[in-house]
């Protein structure tokens, strides 16, 4: 170490300068006492630092245990979470596969049903179009026939009404004719009777008159009788002609009635056939209506299948989203675990660093204790020369300085210049916590019963001046 090299140089200089003055020997003796006090203060400071580092080491050990337990818990939780996420993911994947298979089956079934429905629909549309065209033409034909039939029906009704009116009129005329014939016959009979009577009377009167005036006016009476006979004959001829006309009208009405009956016999089968065709057309229309309803139900089924397919697609997207969320959660948990592991590694490194520093401090303390023991046990004998005593003290001082320089190099102890500039009350600070070690536990210095702050200033200055002189 560099302090040891300096110690060798100082020892060589002390050997070369064999004769020193008595004042220097007295200063050396005083330096020994001051060095003891300085080193005792240094040891107390190191013990206090050791207490703090021991307390910090205990705290770090407790933190390490807590962190190890937390790490175990986190790892266990991670394993549980990973296992749960794997199980959930497996279930979701199984469910997703089942849904995908169901979706594919539904799609295949839907495609097959759609193709069959489309073929059936096209066939039905073609049949419907053909039937529509056929029935449209038939309806047009039937409409024409129906129009003609309606016209014929109206004509028939008109003719029937006319027939009825003519029959009524004929009946009335017949009754009138019969009554008139009866009246005429009755009148004719009565007239004949009356005429007979009148003629008989007239004949009688005429005969009487004729007898009376036969002699006087025979030609005039004959002429008047002939005229009366001609007038009666003309009246009878008129009645006969009128009767013939009525008989002709009666025959014409009967012929019209027979013609109407023949026409009615012809139109009734045609009307019956048209009625049958109309009923058949109504049945076909009902069948087409049923087929349309069936097609509408099939279309509704297709719509429902499409809705089910859309719902399956929505469920599939929701499951994919949930799986993605689970993956993100798994990644977040893994990242948290990695951060926790990094924190644990950092704490472990800090703990190792503290342990290493603690070991170095213990080494420095052991070296200081050994040096102090040697310094305290090294009692100068009377036969030793002052040069040997001085050399031995210089060697002890070099060892102690080397120990202090090592502690200062580690950053765990004050350097000599720091001790010269530190305040007297700086060493009065003690740890606020309890520790495993207290001042005097090493057995090298007495336990602290009073404050040494009043002595540190002079001790530091005397040690520093002594070291400068030896240098």
Swiss-Prot record:
Q: Name one GO biological process term.
A: sperm axoneme assembly
InterPro entries with a match to the protein in the record: CFAP157
Q: Where in the cell is it found?
A: Cytoplasm, Cytoskeleton, Cilium basal body
Annotated stretches, region: Disordered = 1-33, 447-471
Q: Which GO terms describe its molecular function?
A: microtubule binding
* Stretches assigned to coiled coil: 27-190, 225-369
User: Where along the chain is composition biased (Polar residues)?
Assistant: 451-471
Q: Which of UniProt's keywords are assigned here?
A: Cell projection, Cilium, Coiled coil, Cytoplasm, Cytoskeleton, Differentiation, Spermatogenesis
Compositional bias, Basic and acidic residues, is annotated for: 23-33
A single GO CC term for this protein reads: cytoplasm
What domain of life? Eukaryota
Similarity comment: Belongs to the CFAP157 family.
- Record function comment: Specifically required during spermatogenesis for flagellum morphogenesis and sperm motility.
Q: What is this protein called?
A: Cilia- and flagella-associated protein 157
What gene does this protein come from? cfap157
